[in-house]
Amino acid sequence: MIADKALPSRLDDLNLAQSAVNPPQAQDIGVDRLVTDRDGTASDISVTVVPVESAEGHIRPYPKQWEQRTALRDGTAIFIRPLRPEDEPLYKPFFSAVTKQDVRLRFFGPVKEFDHAFLARFIQIDYITAMAFIALDEGTGRMLGVVRLHTNPDGVTGEYAILIRSDLKDRGLGWLLMKTMIDYAPTQGIRVIEGQVLRENSTMLTMCKELGFRVEPDPVDFSVCLVELRTDKF
């Protein structure tokens, strides 16, 4: 807390706004009102910091370092980047390019309407506990696919889900998104990536095996396979 709000001290050398979103996390700011120069600038400022992982209420900024430009097998240039809150308009055209069958395989059932309430669940993301990477066509800006990773409460396992446009299968897009997600997971302390895949989704199961996932039948639901990848193998 600031010791005296009325003190006309300048904190030019201390970027308080940035300290709210970037590590280290400012926990306490103290200003000694007795130690100031003639123009009222405080010269004795103390800041107590704690590591990001232990700072409650920490807001993680957009992770720009995870942006990448690459290409599909046919040479189509794509841009893979973390999801942003303003990306909702990209989703409706994207879902219109996904068949009902592929929607069912992704959500384990039909989706009647991709309205704002439905899409909001995907757009509102906390980078501390979840991540979503979207692939965009460099030429048109259209959304081509998305992979998500949610950290489980234990902090060391995470669950993934992926969906790409139905007309882009077998062009390497799913592989690129999965690899991006797999590379990202250990940087967040996730040691095991988990997922549930319908047994009939042979394309996804084949890719999981090629990526090194262990694939086993769900002991509770025979229609589902459980997939698991240990990130410490890489």
Predicted regions and their residues:
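Long, contiguous binding/interaction regions
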Residues: 2-3, 10-11, 39-234
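N-terminal intrinsically disordered, low-complexity tails
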Residues: 8-31, 36
